[in-house]
Amino acid sequence: MDKSTVYFTDFRCPVGTSQLDKLKKLCIAAGIKDIDMDGKFVAIKMHFGELGNMAFLRPNYAKVVADLCKEQGGMPFLTDCNTLYPGSRKNALEHLNCANLNGFNTITTGCQIIIGDGLRGTDEVEVPVVNGEYCKTARIGHAIMDADIFISLSHFKGHESTGFGGALKNIGMGCGSRAGKMQQHASGKPAINEELCRGCHRCAKECGSDAITYVNKKAVIDYDKCKGCGRCIGACSFDAVYNPNDSANELLDRKMAEYAQAVCHGRPHFHIALVQDISPNCDCHGENDAPILPDIGMFASFDPVALDQACADACLKATPIENSQLGEHLAEPG
């Protein structure tokens, strides 16, 4: 198998050149203009950010990609699917309001926004997963599968369950309908180590399903309500919330990869990732901690796996920021 090519540019900008200029040149160098877009619908998948989060990609970047598509005769639209857990993006109306409040609209992005799985997150297509081992079919947002061409625009950052969130997570989890997200998260649900639990209530505040209560100042999970999203794991500062299934995160990763394959298979696709504002957790949180690594640059490729690998390799070579979650953990003895 031939090696895939990943293109890169850093964020350094001499006078007269902007990051937006560099993103456009990167996409062109990586081959976006080799895709025949004339008269075709182009889905640009990105994350609009949860309300309160400030680490998500700016709408200006989306406009660069949308404008490139329009220059080639394409009809682009930005898209994402509704969330499994309650929040500001659990249905299409609130999702669109969230996108607007975070700066995404027709003026700032140059195109329309369509929520991929409809009003309630039930407008889905069951797509076969070619040679799927963990998922025989994937439940994908209908509007996303209706598009002729698929482009992912991803913010590369940390993630409490998958280690990092990049192109594969943006595509696989992000394009899943609410039922599709449930299928991927079904690998395992968290548990509480009572000896480590401080009764601080952070996990309960983070839980969007009201699945965590307290008995004798210790957290208790209602598994009938728990969705298995893992947000409570990232919220706990004392390692009291954990996944008892040692393979749960690996299964989640594998299911996401199969979902990503279902989204991309059989049509032209192109992928972009910006490694900046590298927060330790997902942009699905209603807050973001300080970046754990310095801004690195922008990547583009026709191969989302190679893209994620290149981003991860670049992050592993970077020096952690001292006054950050990662820097503090590395400084701790043992």
Q: Residue ranges of each PLM-predicted region?
A:
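Terminal amphipathic helices with adjacent charged low-complexity linkers/tails
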Residues: 66-67
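Extended, low-polarity segments enriched in aliphatic/aromatic residues
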Residues: 2-61, 71-80, 85-334
